[in-house]
């Protein structure tokens, strides 16, 4: 898998029109992430449009609810043909297992590939101080992320979303067959934005990430196609 297939661009835009315009300006991008704002505004039709163009889709809605509700959402996402989807690891093992079972069961019924379920460990906007003071978790960032990743493995989840700073730890702890997707990626020379635990693309891959998620460095660039190709070149893709 080359570098272009491993760099996911976040379509963090307000509506379908803006999203489609960006996709058309950056045909080199093969994997797009659709999150809460855009999915709420544009609905499933945008996913279907992306799939019709031959794009891969990471549906990042971070499901977190009772197991039965999450299972229903995962079946619906599977019918859309998404490649990756997210659930919150803090939903607990019954919810995580229900998500995986729903995806595999619906895919088998349809005769199509099942999306990989990724457990979100700790949002990259949170750091140790916020974790301890506001969430009352006092095991530290690495300890908390490791605990949730191990929970995900034991629940049959195919991978995790985590900060690049925890990638090496989780690669060692969870093995080479476990998918690791890292947001909070900032190419050299770009700012951190609202994400506190960041690395460059090359650093994240070196620590064991399978996929990187990049947003504003591409989506707000004067030429998104050029910006994306520069990131791929940075990681030797």
UniProtKB/Swiss-Prot annotation:
Gene source species: Gloeobacter violaceus (strain ATCC 29082 / PCC 7421)
The UniProt record lists the keyword Cell inner membrane: no
Binding site for substrate: 12, 33, 60-69, 124, 186, 195, 215-216
Coiled-coil zones: none
GO molecular function: orotidine-5'-phosphate decarboxylase activity
Family matches, as SUPFAM superfamilies: Ribulose-phoshate binding barrel
Pathway this chain belongs to: Pyrimidine metabolism; UMP biosynthesis via de novo pathway; UMP from orotate: step 2/2
Keyword Lyase belongs to the record: yes
Top-tier EC class: lyase
Free-text function comment from the UniProt entry: Catalyzes the decarboxylation of orotidine 5'-monophosphate (OMP) to uridine 5'-monophosphate (UMP).
Keywords: Decarboxylase, Lyase, Pyrimidine biosynthesis
Protein name: Orotidine 5'-phosphate decarboxylase
Record EC number: 4.1.1.23
Entries under CDD domains matching the protein: OMP_decarboxylase_like (cd04725)
This protein's GO CC annotations: cytosol
Subunit structure: Homodimer.
Annotated family: Belongs to the OMP decarboxylase family. Type 1 subfamily.
């Amino acid at each position: 898998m080359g570098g272009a297939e491993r760099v996911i661009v976040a379509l963090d835009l307000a509506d379908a029109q803006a999203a489609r315009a960006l996709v058309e300006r950056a045909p080199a991008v093969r994997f797009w992430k659709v999150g809460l704002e855009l999915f709420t505004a544009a609905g499933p039709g945008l996913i279907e449009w992306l799939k019709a163009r031959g794009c891969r889709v990471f549906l990042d809605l971070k499901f977190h609810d009772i197991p039965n509700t999450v299972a229903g959402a995962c079946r619906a996402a599977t019918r859309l043909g998404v490649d990756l989807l997210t659930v919150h690891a803090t939903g607990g093992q019954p919810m995580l297992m229900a998500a995986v079972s729903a995806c595999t069961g619906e895919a088998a019924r349809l005769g199509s590939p099942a999306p990989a379920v990724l457990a979100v460990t700790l949002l990259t906007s949170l750091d140790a101080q916020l974790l301890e003071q506001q969430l009352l978790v006092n095991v530290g960032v690495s300890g908390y992320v490791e605990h949730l990743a191990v929970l995900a493995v034991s629940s049959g989840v195919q991978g995790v979303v985590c900060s690049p700073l925890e990638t090496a730890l989780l690669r060692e702890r969870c093995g080479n067959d476990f998918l690791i997707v890292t947001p909070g990626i900032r190419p050299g020379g770009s700012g951190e934005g609202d994400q506190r635990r960041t690395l460059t693309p090359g650093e994240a891959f070196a620590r064991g990430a399978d996929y990187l998620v990049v947003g504003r460095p591409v989506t707000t660039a004067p030429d998104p196609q050029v910006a994306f190709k520069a990131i791929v070149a940075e990681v030797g893709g």
